[in-house]
Amino acid sequence: LCIALFLLSGCEMKKMGGDAASKESYVVTDAFDNQVTIPHKPKKILGTDSAIDTMLLGVVEPSRLAACFIADKDPGMSYIADEVKDIKPEIPLNGISMEILTKISPDLIVASSYTRQKELDMWRSLGYPVVMIDGPTSIAQAEKDIRIIAAAVGETERGEKVVAEMERQLKEVDSTLSARNLPPQTGLLVSQMSRYGGPGSMYHELLTRAGIKNAIAEVGVANGQLLSQELIVKSDPDFFFVSADRESDETGAGKFRDSFLANPAIQNMRAYHRVIPLEDRYIYA
């Protein structure tokens, strides 16, 4: 449904006067109103998660990424697998180590509201410019985030083009769904992240925009709250969304899915007979 998701927020760039170096510098206001000075148009950019890498590659060439996450190279989890196939070093699932940071010495770090505060403080204390985005947990927030990122990397016009294309695709999807006039269905996300998927998540916004009822919301559970087995049974969805098979199951998503579907209580539900596999990138990326 909407591959265009992650990207933009209102920020301003102010040219700084002075010597040659300062003439290249500019100030960006990030999602949390931090005024961040960027010494020059960055060439070695480090994102702190796969979603940020995806947004970055909407506005810069792959050569400007200083590193990428291992998950970026998995086509089942990432939209940018082909673009980052030659990028090194690769950041493991457990995050950015000091060794990697020192090795690549980025001239810009783009972090999110999910980044731990102690890491943000450390990076700033070492002199790295850190620009933060918020979430994103909604389409509107994604558009704001991409505008922040685009300004931070010195590509404001590219950011506006990405947002315009997102809006075009969303309108096209809305028009197609409206013409089909399908009866409402209720879907339940089967996920290891047992607190993910309710109202307040990107998944919920996209699902409901597609005209599908979210079973998590139907039983009163919000994003960040636990969905118990009792509530799963109570939700009585029309179908389950599950993780599709991948070549490797390093995250354990396939094992979790199989265990879930082997539960007798789940097998007695009508949704057990309508299991829809989705690549993880359509759920989490």
PLM regions: where:
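A short, structured surface patch at a secondary-structure boundary
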Residues: 47-102, 108-113, 215
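Alpha-helical, coiled-coil/dimerization segments enriched in small aliphatic residues
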Residues: 198-224
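Bacterial Sec-exported substrate-binding components of ABC uptake systems
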Residues: 10-54, 157-187
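Short helices/loops that flank or line small-molecule/ion binding pockets
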Residues: 95-105, 125-126, 227-236
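Extracytoplasmic ligand-binding site segments that recognize negatively charged/polar headgroups
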Residues: 76, 116-120, 134-148, 182-206, ...
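Bacterial N-terminal signal peptides
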Residues: 1-9
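Short helix-initiation/N-cap motifs at beta->coil->alpha
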Residues: 31-33, 87-99, 136, 220-229
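Structured C-terminal subdomain patch of bacterial secreted/periplasmic proteins
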Residues: 13, 146-153, 160, 164, ...
